[in-house]
A protein has these predicted regions:
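Class II aminoacyl-tRNA synthetase catalytic cores and aaRS-like
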Residues: 1-588
Length: 588
């Protein structure tokens, strides 16, 4: 076995060369006097032609057999412009069957009819598909570019522990029982947050890590229980400088991996402006469908739904879907209404602007003057479809209209899927209040520093305290985020207290961390980028599973290995663990 070339390498300039190729049979066509085989490896496909002298040797060969072929490169009489190797083929002179293959449970091609569960069960076969291999290879190129950039900026790559102390705030931890310390548990890291801050206290100044993280939470298309993030921290740098590092990193990745020169600096937007304009803090700015605040415009309209919301201190917002009045039937509008209801809206009001006037169920509630003011406010013209959501809760209005906006953007093809729009969103609220729990939660995490102008608000006005935090958004996805960090013991204590932590809880869960601030902790900041999500977006995929070699399914299980599985009682006994039947409150 002495492979001379891969299966995506040979060109017309290689005609008459003697070569040896090895690969999987992607397709076999027996024409009697001639047999054609498409030989595949991760680099591509090369067509091999066998004369009838090979018929006996090839009679049992089928897809996914591995062949070692020696032969001569010849020019194809019928060229294939869709293949890089389409100008040539190999005239076989010798063939060896390296290994046989059973009939596969799925078609191994970019277009496969296999169900998701089958693809996951036979992931090693699914990974043979060229499209999936390209994704995994592109992901590797992203990682290489990240290393090159951060190394060039004098960041030090440092590994942090996987076996950590559990700090149950936010998502649930994956727990690891200790055999040596029965009854005690480690937690797998949800992020390296505390350790990377301690590395700043230690004086490393610039740290990074391609970090594996674990969160025991419900899955969706862009979530996995174990995921990878690009984790970066630095000392003595202001927010603009930190953002500059993030932009430089992304520019390097986009150039090296996609051959795209992104323009710096990226646009910036405050959290408040993002919510007002797009209804979401991770807006897709590839299309220009914006929310319109109508509180003042409709305050005197005699429509009880609007009136009751506004009288209760609520909000009314609208969307102008330009030129779509005739294209949206009542059935299609009802579908948008159901989408709004998924986000807790009570309904969706609408109007159509026609050459005969304004029509729709709520048109009768407007006076001529009020309707004129509405049309002017929404920049409405003949042919436009106007959509409205009102509610006493600001976030309900925003969430519902943001979901409708994103749905319309995709349905109406309002953006170029090949376009990449980056955006920084900043000035986040430091805290968000849970009416259900009667307490504040950190919008990012408890170690985020308030803006210098809002330091006093931690204690006196937490609802209006702004964080010195920033998220990077790409095409409507939160790609990552970061912040300046608290580095003073006293300020960190105040932040914990604002979150309702008792001193006992602070000492028990975070005392070991906060104690480091007593020894000259430097001002520091950082960010993390979701590597899986970045790869998903650069590969044009809809699911993280398409850019992770061995992902979990939506039940957080691995159909291939069957993980998680029960373990032997002897193993549990060593750990001091006894498993009992548990019935959740939901199932009682």
């Amino acid at each position: 076995m002495n492979r001379t070339h891969n299966n995506g390498e040979l060109r017309i300039t290689d005609v008459n060369k003697k070569v040896e190729l090895i690969g999987w049979v992607a397709k076999k066509r027996n024409l009697g006097a001639l047999v054609f085989v498409d030989l595949r490896d991760r680099h591509g496909i090369t067509q091999v032609i066998f004369d009838e002298s090979f018929n006996e040797q090839l009679k049992d060969v089928k897809n996914e057999y591995i062949l070692d072929i020696k032969g001569t490169v010849v020019e194809r009489s019928s060229k294939n412009p869709d293949m890089p190797t389409g100008d040539i083929e190999i005239q076989a002179e010798e063939v060896k069957i390296v290994n046989k293959a059973a009939t596969t449970p799925m078609i191994i091609a970019d277009e496969t009819d296999a169900l998701e569960e089958t693809r996951m069960k036979y992931r090693y076969l699914d990974l043979r598909r060229p499209a999936l291999q390209k994704n995994i290879i592109r992901r590797a190129k992203i990682v290489r570019a990240i290393h090159e950039y951060l190394d060039s900026e004098e960041f030090v790559e440092i590994e942090t522990p996987y076996l950590n102390k559990s700090t149950p705030e936010g998502a649930r931890d994956f727990l690891v029982p200790s055999r040596v310390h029965n009854g005690s548990f480690y937690a797998l890291p949800q992020s390296p947050q505390l350790f990377k801050q301690l590395l700043m206290v230690a004086g490393f100044e610039r740290y990074y890590q391609i970090a594996r993280c674990f969160r025991d939470e419900d899955l969706r298309a862009d979530r996995q229980p174990e995921f990878t993030q690009v984790d970066v921290e630095m000392s003595f740098m202001n927010t603009d400088q930190v953002i500059g590092i993030g932009e430089g990193l992304i520019k390097k990745v986009m150039k090296d991996v996609m051959n795209i020169d992104v323009q710096l600096p990226f646009p910036r937007m405050t959290w408040h402006d993002a919510m007002e304009t797009y209804g979401i803090d991770k807006p897709d700015t590839r299309f220009d469908l914006k929310l319109v605040n109508l509180n003042e415009t409709v305050k005197d309209v005699d429509f009880v739904v609007f009136k009751s919301a506004l009288e209760a201190g609520g909000h009314v917002k609208g969307l102008n879907v330009k030129g779509e009045a005739d294209n949206y039937s009542r059935k299609k509008i009802d579908a948008l209404t159901e989408l709004a209801k998924k986000y807790k809206a009570k309904g969706l009001a609408w109007l159509k602007v026609t050459d005969k006037g304004v029509s729709g169920p709520i048109a009768k509630f407007f006076t001529e003057e009020q309707m004129s003011a509405l049309l002017e406010k929404m920049n409405a013209e003949v042919g436009d479809l106007l959509l409205f959501v009102s509610d006493t809760h600001y976030m309900v209005v925003c969430d519902a209209l943001a979901a409708i906006r994103n749905h319309l953007g995709k349905e109406l093809k309002l953006y170029d899927p090949r376009q990449f729009n980056f955006l920084w969103v900043g000035d986040f609220p430091m805290f968000e209040y849970s009416e259900e729990d009667g307490r504040y939660y950190a919008m990012h995490h408890p170690f985020t520093r308030p803006k210098d102008s809002d330091l006093d608000k931690i204690d006196t006005d937490p609802a209006n305290c702004l964080a010195d935090a920033y998220d990077i958004v790409l095409n409507g996805f939160e790609l990552g985020g970061g912040s300046q960090r608290i580095y003073e013991e006293e300020l960190q204590d105040r932040a914990f207290k604002a979150l309702g932590f008792t001193q006992e809880r602070i000492d028990a869960q975070f005392g070991w961390f906060v104690d480091a601030f007593r020894y000259g902790a430097p001002p520091h900041a950082g960010f993390a980028l979701g590597l899986d999500r970045f790869a998903m977006l650069l590969c044009g995929c809809d699911s993280l599973r398409d850019v992770i070699a061995f992902p979990k399914n939506t039940s957080a299980t691995c159909p291939m290995s069957k993980a998680p599985t029960p373990v032997d009682n002897d193993q549990l006994k060593d750990l001091g663990i006894e498993v009992t039947e548990y019935e959740s409150e939901e199932n009682k």
